[in-house]
C-alpha cells in the first residue's frame, strides 16, 4: 500500500462548494474529472498525440521549455567544470478524463513515452470540477487493448504544482536556476500575457511589460511552503508589479528527476538513486529538508493559505477577453493567458485551430460568484472545446498595493 496516498482529514474545498452550489441550481452540471498534464520532449510529441487521438479525448497543447543544469569539464585539462543552463523545447498536453480512468491513462502514457526513464518528461493529474458541453469520456476498448504496465510503485502522491507568474524579462531563467540549485525539480518555463497588476500601478505601468514568463514547479507537498518563501526572496516578488504565485494540489504524478546533464561518475545516476529511494519509502516524505517554522516570517502576511481557487478558462480568442475581465471585475487576484492548440479525436469536427487558456486566481469567498458570471456569458452549451475548470489553490502570494 502506498503510504502517501492514504486519506487524511478532510479540509475545506472551494471546488466542492462550487459543485454543490451548481448542482442545487440545476442549470449546469459540473463534471468531477481529473486533469492530466503531460510535459514531454517535443521529439516524443507525435507518440503522445497519436495515443490521445485514439483515446478520443480533446487535449490542449502549449509550447514551453525545460531548464536543466549542464556541466562540462574545462578545456586543456584545467581543474573544475563549466556550468551553464540547457533549454529543451517541450510540448505540454492538458486534457481531462473521468477520475476512475486516471491511473490507467497515466500508466499508458508512461508506457508510450517511456516516462519512467529520467529526462523524457513529467506527467501528473489534478482532481477538479469541469464545466463543458459534454462529459469527458475515453475509448475504454482502446485503453484495455493498450495493456500498459502498472507503475504504482513509482507514481508519487502528496505533490504540489507551484506556478510563478513573473513580469520581468529573463526572470524565468533566473528563478529556474534557483530551483535547480535547491534540487526541487526540472523547471518548466512558458510564456503568456497578463495585465491585472499592471493596470493598477498608474504611471509606473509603462515600465512593466504585459508579457509574462511562467515557471511551473512540481514538488513534494511538505516542502512547498518553505520553497515558495525562498523563491519569493530570490525573485523579489515582494515588490509591486513583479508577479504572483499560486499553488495547486497534485493527486498523483511522475516528475522528471534529470536535473543535471553531464558525465556520469558513478555506477548509478543521482536520478536513479532518488527514484529507488522514492519506491522504497513509498513517497517523497524522506526528501524533506526545509523547516517552514524556521524560515523568514516577514512575508507571512502576504502568503494566503486560505483556500483560493484556480479558475481556468479555455475559449476562442474573440471571447476570452470578455470572460477574463468578468473575473477580474469581481475580485480575482491575478490572471495570465497563453495560446493553446486543441488536439481533437478523429470524430471531432468544427474545432478552432488556436484557442486561449486563461488561468485566474480567485479568493474562495467569491469563487461561486465568479463561476456564475462565467457560465452566464460563456458559450459552453454551444462549443465542444470550451472549458471552465475549478481547482483548489490552498496558497497564493501577490503583492498588495496600499
What is the predicted function of each stretch?
Residues 2-402:
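Positively charged, small/polar-rich N-terminal and surface patches that mediate targeting and assembly
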